[in-house]
């Protein structure tokens, strides 16, 4: 999360230099990178919509068309995890630094910590469609390409329904490859793997995205569930919303003249929406 503080900030330079280094939080877990656009958070609850597909009818040209509105289903789930963060910020005058600037610092600090809590999210992610593979002698790149082909085929656009009144469903393509240490080591040996180096724009945006292969962003995690080699997914099948439930700034800190005390709580949660958009691969047993 970044902010244009140079235009909106009215405090002193010393305070600004203390706050700015923390506002560009690094996100580590892939759902944090790919927050669904149709998710809202209110308090400790996340709301999202399951949009239904268009109706498709077939018949002679010029026939009367009936309007059928299927609408969308609104659903919700609780954000049952939270992080609290707080501390003393020295040499910051409460009167000269607005609470939104302090709040942004707290939220971004909490963002970095929340993103490190991969285990809960990965456990939920691993509930996707179970797949097995036999490691190719030609390397991990071939395994990835085969897995992408399976994903795209199973998520291709399909017409469902009866007769001439059908609906189009699907159309999702694989966009992300989540790998653990073992499979990542194999992937690095493939010349098709494009590794991103520190300092590149992509790396700066999300430190967990380590490169690209086969048209997919490669996300590295050290906390892959046991037995899972890699996960091929489209982020639309998974939600990881975050929200701030409270932020407070206190003007006086005992024993620290000229300092303020700030604290905040961030709530978050994980939910698998479509198991078929998350393919979880384990090596086939010999």
Go through the PLM ranges and name each one.
Residues 89-163, 279-286:
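Alpha-helical scaffold segments that mediate packing/assembly in large oligomeric complexes
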Residues 63-68, 108, 112:
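Near-N-terminal "mature-domain entry" segment
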Residues 70-96:
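Short acidic, glycine/tyrosine-flanked loop/strand segments centered on an H-E-D-like triad
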Residues 23, 30-33, 39-55, 63, ...:
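Surface-exposed, low-hydrophobicity beta-strand/loop segments enriched in small/polar/acidic residues
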Residues 2-21, 25, 95, 114-118, ...:
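Short, Lys/Arg-rich flexible segments
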Residues 129-203:
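Extended, solvent-exposed, turn-rich assembly/linker loops in the middle of proteins
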Residues 2-7, 14, 19, 33, ...:
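Sequence/fold signature of self-assembling virion shell proteins
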